[in-house]
Swiss-Prot record:
Domain notes: Has the structural arrangement of an alpha-helix connected to antiparallel beta-sheets by disulfide bonds (CS-alpha/beta).
Tissue-by-tissue expression: Expressed by the venom gland.
One cellular component term from this protein's GO annotations in UniProt: extracellular region
Listed name of the protein: Beta-mammal toxin Co1
Subcellular location: Secreted
Organism this protein belongs to: Centruroides ornatus (Scorpion)
Length: 66
């Protein structure tokens, strides 16, 4: 599974500005989803890869980013 890293309190994606390989996104994806996860910056949001199937990613149901 893969998807955008989401802030559970706001419903917003984690923003990033350095597209492609991005240490911030990689670190945040690993912190939230475990050391097996990967991450990079895609369309100005942190995109996480190699997630477990139950991982929660953006968008959150009933929670819009504002």
């Amino acid at each position: 599974k893969e998807g955008y890293l989401v802030n559970h309190s706001t419903g917003c994606k984690y923003e990033c500005f350095k597209l492609g390989d991005n240490d911030y996104c990689l670190r945040e994806c690993k912190q939230q989803y475990g050391k097996g996860a990967g991450g990079y910056c895609y369309a100005f949001g942190c995109w996480c890869t190699h997630l477990y199937e139950q991982a929660v990613v953006w968008p959150l149901p009933k929670k819009t980013c504002n």
